[in-house]
């Protein structure tokens, strides 16, 4: 047996000896010229029966292009590649398709010719693409739109930009119901209620997958993270969710059920635990509930290195019900270890066959057996005017007007305005995490350098485009200029993603520099219009009091002009809060329906020009 402690070149040689023999088995009964005869699901059992154990395990492996070459895909039969393009500044769709096709060509040269599937995290547009893709508002903003039809169109927009680069599978949508704004992934949630989860789960799946998954633009969707990750205690990412069975079923499951009913091809498990049991090791959740009770027949996928990060074993993950494992470099040791677990009887072959059946079923549904190579059909849609117009509409509809004293908004396009603040001219900040790289396009806490967001418009440039360059006085990040009567102060959070966004309740505040900036303009008698860029409500009561108008703009993405169009009256505000806005740290967590519910702004609150409203 190959030992899991083997590493590097010696390990690859050892694996190759096993695979080199096993992949040579005759397969004429299920293949024609190396391409499997899978045209319907009825063909899958014969292919499964003809596969070696090594080939089956290869299909269950997903890794990224930094960890596996196209030749590795051919030699070891790897089932999926995550297209996290290394920092090579590949800015064209053709360059990405070329990479995808290089991997696919090698997959098609395996004994059975089973295609691999290229996948990516596209959680708010094709946000990892180095070029001019459209970056959409994050889910917290989309939830504020209360417009599921728009969200379906945005998902279809994303699918077209993904397909233009050879990507056929996205790890989206996140349909967590976030119940504590301390949680660093709150911005990935549509809101604090199951009603919003259900309002947007199916439009996302419909937009990605379309009526015909084999269509040139369609991509497979992933509902995540199963289950109750938004309910983690104290908002601790990857922590434990203490929930009753009724809460689990009534609050956190319905969106997944809706996605399953619509045919979502995959579901990703949560890093977190439910009532002390890690989801990545839970047969009760992944098999008994998800597969058996809910009837999900798609692929159940781990999160990134979810087994290792969760402190679990491959045996636990396999027997819990995972079909595909997301690995980095560890695929090199995990594949022989998985084979050994089956050969020793610790994992039954039936469990492996179930996994591979689901993987082949997904690939069939994605049209990979009939159309394995990428298509340039939607290359011209990447960053197109039509796509940016739609994203700008999403920005406009996501904005929530919290305050508008004396009807100061909309502003007059003929007047001069000061624009100031850390987020006024910073596209990376307005896009947030999961943009160009994991923690965001800025220079992040890990020291990864900033990446450009090509084609994006900052908020200040959006204002300039709308009212003219001469009417905008740029005061920089923290400058003071009292020439104009009105100052648009754009401030907020620095981007973060999972693992870096959790906060103590008392720390959900603006920086001291930002607070001082707002106060300085207020004390000078300037009318302050505060635009807050954040992934959740913050404790900003004092800043609201110091502002004549206050706008929650969330994380609007690449189309900053959408903010300007509403501030200056081309469009009205229509956004509504998907989260209750706390008065103070002691109220956190606060959710609609709580006893003694008394937030600063209620769930569903949002003003239009001239009146306030509460929709739910």
Model regions and ranges:
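Bacterial N-terminal signal peptides that target proteins for export
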Residues: 1-9
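Compositionally biased, intrinsically disordered low-complexity regions
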Residues: 8-12, 24
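C-terminal motif of bacterial Sec signal peptides marking the signal peptidase cleavage site
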Residues: 18-20
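Glycoside hydrolase catalytic-domain context in secreted enzymes
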Residues: 22-616
């Amino acid at each position: 047996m190959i030992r899991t402690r083997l590493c590097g070149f010696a390990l690859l040689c050892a694996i190759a000896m096993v695979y080199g023999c096993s992949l040579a088995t005759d397969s004429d009964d299920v293949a024609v010229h190396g391409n499997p005869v899978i045209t319907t699901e009825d063909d899958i059992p014969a292919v499964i029966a003809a596969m070696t154990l090594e080939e089956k395990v290869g299909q269950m492996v997903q890794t990224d292009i930094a960890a596996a070459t196209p030749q590795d895909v051919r030699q070891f039969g790897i089932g999926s590649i995550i297209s996290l393009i290394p920092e090579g500044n590949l800015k064209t769709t053709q360059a990405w398709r070329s990479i995808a096709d290089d991997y696919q060509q090698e997959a098609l040269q395996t004994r059975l010719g089973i295609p691999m599937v290229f996948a990516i995290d596209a959680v708010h547009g094709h946000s990892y693409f180095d070029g001019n893709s459209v970056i959409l508002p994050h889910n917290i903003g989309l939830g504020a739109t209360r417009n599921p039809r728009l969200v379906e169109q945005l998902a279809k927009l994303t699918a077209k930009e993904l397909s233009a680069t050879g990507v056929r599978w996205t790890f989206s949508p996140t349909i967590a119901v976030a119940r504590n704004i301390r949680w660093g992934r709150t911005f990935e949630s549509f809101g604090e209620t199951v009603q919003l989860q259900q309002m947007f789960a199916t439009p996302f799946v419909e937009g990605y997958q379309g009526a015909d998954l084999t269509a040139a633009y369609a991509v497979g969707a992933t509902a995540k993270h199963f289950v109750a990750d938004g309910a983690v205690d104290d908002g601790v990412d990857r922590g434990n969710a203490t929930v009753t069975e009724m809460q689990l079923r009534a609050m956190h499951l319905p969106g997944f059920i809706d996605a399953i009913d619509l045919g979502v091809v995959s579901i990703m498990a949560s890093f977190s635990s439910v009532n002390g049991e890690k989801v990545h090791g839970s047969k009760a959740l992944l098999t008994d509930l998800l597969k058996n009770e809910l009837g999900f027949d798609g692929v159940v996928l781990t999160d990134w290195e979810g087994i290792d990060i969760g402190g679990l074993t491959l045996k636990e993950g396999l027997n819990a019900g995972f079909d595909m494992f997301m690995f980095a470099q560890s695929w090199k040791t995990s594949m022989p270890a998985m084979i050994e677990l089956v050969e020793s009887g610790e994992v039954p072959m039936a469990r492996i066959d179930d996994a591979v059946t689901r993987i082949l079923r997904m690939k069939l549904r994605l049209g990979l057996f009939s159309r394995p190579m990428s298509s340039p059909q939607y290359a011209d849609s990447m960053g197109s005017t039509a796509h940016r117009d739609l994203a700008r509409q999403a920005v406009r509809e996501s904005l929530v007007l919290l305050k508008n004293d004396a009807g100061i908004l909309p502003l007059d396009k003929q007047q001069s305005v000061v624009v100031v603040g850390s987020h006024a001219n910073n596209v990376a900040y307005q896009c947030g995490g999961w943009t160009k790289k994991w923690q965001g396009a800025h220079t992040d806490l890990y020291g990864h350098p900033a990446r450009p967001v090509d084609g994006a418009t900052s908020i200040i440039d959006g204002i300039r485009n709308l009212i003219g360059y001469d009417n905008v006085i740029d005061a920089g990040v923290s400058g003071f200029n009292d020439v104009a009567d009105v100052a648009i102060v754009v401030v907020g959070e620095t981007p973060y993603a999972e693992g870096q966004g959790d906060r103590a309740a008392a720390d959900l505040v603006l920086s001291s520099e930002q607070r001082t900036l707002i106060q300085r303009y207020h004390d000078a008698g300037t009318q302050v219009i505060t635009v807050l860029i954040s992934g959740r409500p913050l404790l900003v009561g004092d800043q609201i009091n110091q502002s004549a108008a206050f706008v929650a703009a969330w994380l609007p993405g690449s189309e900053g002009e959408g903010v300007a169009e509403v501030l200056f009256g081309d469009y009205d505000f229509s956004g509504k809060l998907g989260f209750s806005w706390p008065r103070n740290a002691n109220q956190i967590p606060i959710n609609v329906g709580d006893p003694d519910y008394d937030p600063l702004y209620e769930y569903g609150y949002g003003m239009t020009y001239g009146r306030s409203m509460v929709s739910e």
